[in-house]
Amino acid sequence: ALHAEKHDGEEPGPFAANSFDMVQLVALALEQAGACTGVAINENIRSVSEGGEPVSSFAAGKEVIAAGGDVDYEGAAGPMTFDESGTVAGSYSIKAARDGAWVDEKFYPASAFE
C-alpha cells in the first residue's frame, strides 16, 4: 500500500517483498555487528532472523539491538528463518498477468513448507 501511495497507484512487482526483506536483513546484520563487511553479514544474518523479539522493520530492529536485545525479523514476504544450507523457505504466491496487472491465483504460506 505504501509503495502504491508513493508511485501513483502502481503496485510493486512480484519480487518486491523479497528484495525489501533482503535489504532489511543485511541492514540488521550490519547493525548488530557494528561493522560493514561481508564477514559481518555472514556472522550475523541468521541471528537477526530467528530467536529474538519479532520485528518487521529496520527501525524497530535497531531499537531492540541498541537496547541489547536479540531480534527476529519477520519480513514482508513472511518469516525469514534460514535452514542448514542457508535457504529461507518463504511464502509463495502464484500470480498471473491480467489486463496489465499482477493478480494472485493461489497463496502458500511459509508454514506450508516446514
Give, region by region, the residue ranges found by the protein language model.
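Extracytosolic ligand-binding ectodomains
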Residues: 1-114
